[in-house]
């Protein structure tokens, strides 16, 4: 029985390791993006701190924005908006629950290539208890901080797809340059009489 349990555990480990499964909160950042510049209008803001923390957790070395290196990809954080909509109401018509939506836009500039826009949305529910105003404010601040962390995780998770899009655009450019003939094809301008 002990050997069977060991065999099943070993098989489970091999299957999860072989299929590319990774632990949560770890992203395979492409090797070309292991050194990056983080550019933000508010470098000490909550989103910048959360993104900087996620990049460091994923083994990305961050360079100063004023660096002289121009061959390094740059993650530029854009606008952040937080909206709050009523999700449910009490019998008396007061708001009982809010749905908060955080929208974050950013772009990745790969030198000599292109600018790739990325965006993410994070949704959270927030219960509004009118009898506990102070606790409500503290809870809302905690939820917003958590939303910044989740948005940063989602932005970092999109970095491999940007690398894939960059490779795909390179392949398309090489195929269009090899497929075009050396002399332009003759185009008829008559209406086919």
From Swiss-Prot:
- Sites of N-palmitoyl cysteine lipid attachment are 19
Q: Where is the lipid attached (S-diacylglycerol cysteine)?
A: 19
Q: Offer one example of a GO biological process linked to this entry.
A: Gram-negative-bacterium-type cell outer membrane assembly
Low complexity compositional bias, start-end? 174-186
Write down the PROSITE patterns for this protein, in alphabetical order: PROKAR_LIPOPROTEIN
Provide a GO CC annotation, any one.
cell outer membrane
What membrane topology does the annotation report for this chain? Lipid-anchor
Q: Where is the signal peptide?
A: 1-18
Keywords, A to Z, come to:
Cell outer membrane, Lipoprotein, Membrane, Palmitate, Signal
Tell me where it resides.
Cell outer membrane
User: Where is the region Disordered?
Assistant: 166-193
The protein's GO terms of the molecular function aspect are: lipopolysaccharide binding
The family database entries (NCBIfam families) matched by this protein are listed as: PRK10796.1
- What PANTHER family is this protein classified in? LPS-ASSEMBLY LIPOPROTEIN LPTE (PTHR38098:SF1)
Q: Fill in the subunit field for this protein.
A: Component of the lipopolysaccharide transport and assembly complex. Interacts with LptD.
Name the job this protein performs.
Answer: Together with LptD, is involved in the assembly of lipopolysaccharide (LPS) at the surface of the outer membrane. Required for the proper assembly of LptD. Binds LPS and may serve as the LPS recognition site at the outer membrane.
Q: Which family does it belong to?
A: Belongs to the LptE lipoprotein family.
> What name does the UniProt record give this protein?
LPS-assembly lipoprotein LptE
The organism encoding this protein is: Escherichia coli O157:H7
